[in-house]
């Protein structure tokens, strides 16, 4: 099997940590700010998603973000569960795992800044700029171009914020010995 998709063994400690991170992402997700309802939402959950990818690797991050989306949807009471949204979240989890599993970050390392920039750009391109507008068009009837005209393009300003927050927080968290052990840093 390709080592790119290598995931860690699911130990009880890793399972409990992922479950706690899912709960944390669920709670932090409630702090989301809707700019344009059902279309443009600013959320701080990305930092927890980075941690899930860092600890769980691609496969467990895929599963964890799918579980998070299902729990979030079921608890919302809206009754509008659409499997494609869950798959989109899961695929984003896969990318978080691919980019951040076994990846130690340093504020002073330019290669780490480039790595986080590429990771953030790809994850946001897939999630925020391609598939979310496509799903909104399919399920809510809002044309792709109209979403960008209405303000979806403003998400581009979120990219540098995500990069700065990730590089400010993750190197500090990665200094925790238990987290280093769970993340399998080389």
UniProtKB/Swiss-Prot annotation:
The keyword Nucleus does not apply. The chain crosses the membrane at residues 16-36, 47-67, 81-101, 116-136, 153-173. It comes from the Bacteria. Folate-binding protein that interacts with the energy-coupling factor (ECF) ABC-transporter complex. Unlike classic ABC transporters this ECF transporter provides the energy necessary to transport a number of different substrates. The substrates themselves are bound by transmembrane, not extracytoplasmic soluble proteins. GO terms for molecular function: folic acid binding. Keywords: Cell membrane, Folate-binding, Membrane, Transmembrane, Transmembrane helix, Transport. Its main location: membrane. This is Folate transporter FolT. GO terms for cellular component: plasma membrane. Forms a stable energy-coupling factor (ECF) transporter complex composed of a membrane-embedded substrate-binding protein (S component), two ATP-binding proteins (A components) and a transmembrane protein (T component). It is a multi-pass membrane protein. InterPro entries: ECF_S_folate_fam (IPR030949), ECF_substrate-spec-like (IPR009825). Signal peptide: none annotated. It comes from Streptococcus mutans serotype c (strain ATCC 700610 / UA159). It is found in: Cell membrane.
């Amino acid at each position: 099997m390709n080592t790119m998709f290598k995931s860690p063994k699911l130990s009880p400690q890793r399972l409990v940590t992922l479950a706690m991170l899912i709960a944390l992402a669920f709670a932090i997700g409630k702090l989301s700010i809707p700019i344009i309802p059902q279309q443009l939402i600013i959320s701080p959950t990305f930092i927890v998603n980075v941690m899930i990818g860092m600890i769980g690797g691609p496969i467990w991050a895929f599963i964890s973000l799918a579980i998070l989306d299902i729990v979030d949807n079921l608890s919302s009471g809206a009754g509008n569960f659409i499997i494609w949204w869950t798959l989109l979240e899961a695929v984003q989890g896969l990318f978080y795992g691919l980019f951040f599993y076994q990846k130690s970050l340093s504020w002073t390392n330019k290669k780490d800044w480039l790595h986080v920039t590429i990771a953030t750009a790809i994850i946001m391109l897939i999630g925020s700029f391609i598939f979310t507008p496509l799903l909104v068009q399919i399920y809510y009837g809002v044309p792709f171009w109209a979403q960008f005209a209405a303000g979806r393009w403003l998400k581009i300003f979120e990219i540098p914020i995500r990069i700065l927050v990730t590089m400010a927080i993750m190197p500090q968290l990665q200094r925790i010995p238990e987290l280093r052990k769970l993340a399998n840093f080389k």
